[in-house]
C-alpha cells in the first residue's frame, strides 16, 4: 500500500519550516525553527480533510493532556497549541531526533539501558494513571529520545480518561503491543491493558521484535492477533536476560488481566528488583506525589471525571478503528 504524500506545511508566524518529520493517519509532523526563543521544534498539524468538530475536540484533548502531563521528565514537552491561518489545528512540541522504534530493530540494546527505559516510561504511565489518563498506544515508536539521551513518552492522540468507557469505544491501536482483551473489543483500555503494553514494549526492546512476532513467519494482523490471544509469551532469546526478568515480562502479558501486575507502579518495582539482582544502579521512580499533581484529569466537556473503575471513555468520542500492522 502506497503511503500518502505529506500535506503542505502551514505558514506559522514566528516559525520557519525546515522539513517533514513524519506522517500519520490524521496528522503530519514537521520540523520548524522557532524564532524566539530560537530552537528546533516538532509541529504536529492535523490534515485538513479530517478536521471536523469531533477530531478538533480530540486534538484539543491531546494538547490539554500533554500540557498537563509534560512537566514529567519522561513525557514529551508541549510548548503551545493553536490553529493555523488555513484552519488546521497544530501542536508545537519538543523536538527529539530519534525514536526507540528506529533503534531496537537495528541494534541490540544493552540490558541495563532497557531496564532503565522501562522504569522511566512506566513512571510516566503511572503518573498519567494517577491523573486519570490512559495513554492507550504504548509502543517503542512512541518513545522518543531527547538530545540528552532521556527517553520520553509521546503521542497522547488516543489517550482517554479513567472512569467511563464502553468496550465498543473505537480507538486507534497498534496490534503487536495491544492486550488480548483490547483486540477482542472487550474493553477500550484499562490499567491492566497498559501493563500489558509496557511489558510488550520492554520485551520488544530486548528481543528486537514484538513478543508474538515470528522472524520469517506469518506476521500479518490476523495471525498476530491469534497468537496474542492464545499463545504463551516466548522467551526473549537473549542469554543475558535473567529468568526473573523473563518471569516479570510473562506475568505482565498474562492472558487474564487479573494475573498481571496490578499497576504500572508494581511493574516498576519488579524491574527495579531485577536491577538489584544484577547489581545495576537502581533507576529512580519518577511519580509525582503532591496534591496538585494528583488533581483530576482534564475534562473538556465535564463528562469524564475520574471514576472508581479502570475502563476509559475516549476523549475524542467515537473515532474510527485503525489497526497498525506488525511492524512499527
Residue ranges of predicted features:
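Conserved short submotifs of the Hanks-type protein kinase catalytic core
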Residues: 85-99, 103
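Protein kinase glycine-rich loop
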Residues: 18-24, 29
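Protein kinase catalytic-loop region centered on the HRD/HxD motif
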Residues: 121-133
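A short, aromatic-enriched beta-strand patch in the conserved N-lobe beta-sheet
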Residues: 80-82
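AlphaC helix of the eukaryotic protein kinase fold
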Residues: 45-69
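Conserved HRD-motif arginine in the catalytic loop of eukaryotic-like protein kinases
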Residues: 260
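Activation segment signature within eukaryotic-like protein kinase domains
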Residues: 117-118
Amino acid at each position: 500500500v502506497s503511503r500518502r504524500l505529506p500535506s503542505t506545511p502551514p505558514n506559522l508566524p514566528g516559525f520557519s519550516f525546515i522539513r517533514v518529520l513524519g506522517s500519520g493517519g490524521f496528522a503530519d509532523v514537521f520540523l520548524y525553527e522557532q524564532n524566539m526563543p530560537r530552537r528546533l521544534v516538532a509541529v504536529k498539524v492535523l490534515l485538513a480533510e479530517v478536521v471536523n468538530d469531533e477530531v478538533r475536540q480530540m486534538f484539543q484533548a491531546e494538547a490539554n493532556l500533554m500540557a498537563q502531563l509534560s512537566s514529567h521528565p519522561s513525557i514529551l514537552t508541549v510548548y503551545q497549541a493553536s490553529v493555523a491561518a488555513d484552519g488546521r489545528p497544530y501542536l508545537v512540541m519538543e523536538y527529539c531526533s530519534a525514536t526507540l522504534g528506529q533503534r531496537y530493530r537495528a541494534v541490540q540494546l544493552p540490558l541495563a539501558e532497557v531496564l532503565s527505559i522501562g522504569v522511566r516510561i512506566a513512571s510516566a504511565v503511572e503518573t498519567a494513571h494517577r491523573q486519570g489518563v490512559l495513554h492507550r498506544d504504548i509502543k517503542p515508536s512512541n518513545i522518543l529520545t531527547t538530545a540528552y539521551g532521556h527517553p520520553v513518552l509521546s503521542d497522547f492522540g488516543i489517550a482517554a480518561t479513567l472512569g467511563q468507557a464502553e468496550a465498543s469505544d473505537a480507538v486507534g491501536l497498534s496490534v503487536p503491543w495491544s492486550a488480548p482483551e483490547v483486540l477482542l473489543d472487550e474493553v477500550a483500555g484499562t490499567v491492566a491493558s497498559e501493563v500489558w503494553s509496557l511489558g510488550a514494549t520492554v520485551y520488544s526492546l530486548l528481543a528486537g521484535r514484538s513478543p508474538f512476532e515470528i522472524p520469517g513467519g506469518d506476521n500479518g494482523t490476523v495471525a498476530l492477533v491469534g497468537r496474542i490471544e492464545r499463545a504463551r509469551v516466548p522467551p526473549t532469546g537473549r542469554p543475558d536476560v535473567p529468568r526473573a526478568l523473563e518471569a516479570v515480562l510473562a506475568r505482565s502479558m498474562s492472558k487474564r488481566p487479573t494475573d498481571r501486575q496490578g499497576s504500572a507502579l508494581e511493574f516498576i518495582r519488579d524491574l527495579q528488583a531485577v536491577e538489584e539482582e544484577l547489581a545495576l544502579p537502581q533507576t529512580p521512580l519518577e511519580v509525582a506525589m503532591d496534591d496538585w499533581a494528583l488533581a483530576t484529569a482534564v475534562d473538556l466537556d465535564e463528562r469524564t471525571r475520574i471514576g472508581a473503575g479502570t475502563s476509559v471513555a475516549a476523549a475524542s468520542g467515537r473515532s474510527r478503528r485503525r489497526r497498525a500492522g506488525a511492524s512499527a
